[in-house]
Amino acid sequence: MSLYSLFKTNKDLEVKGIDLQYGDDILITIARAGGANPIYARVVEAKTKPYRRQIQSETISRELSEQLTREIYAEAIVLGWSGVTDENGKAMEFTKENAVKLFKDLPDLFEDIKEQA
């Protein structure tokens, strides 16, 4: 087996996304964080620009950094979902706001999505 077969990526899928399946009926479609995904680079630039000095001097709070990361993933990485419900079992429409809420409420899910992206 070659390194190329292990690490070469599909540039089309990096942008159009892949489905992550959780349980029997929950699908979350994600794009790649980086690589051939120009939307990710643009969103990171736009979201972090107001905080660049804090980021560079490492004075940005952990809470703000985590919030920015959730917003970036909600806007540039998660492309959609199906079968996602809130804590009461009510269907959650895919919106950026709902994605940020889900990431904040379920940090282990967010960690998994970050690892997969």
Enumerate the language-model features and the residues they cover.
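Extended acidic low-complexity intrinsically disordered regions
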Residues: 1-14
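Short, surface-exposed, charged amphipathic helix/loop patches that serve as local interaction elements
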Residues: 22, 26-117
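Short acidic-hydrophobic surface loop/beta-edge motif
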Residues: 13-23
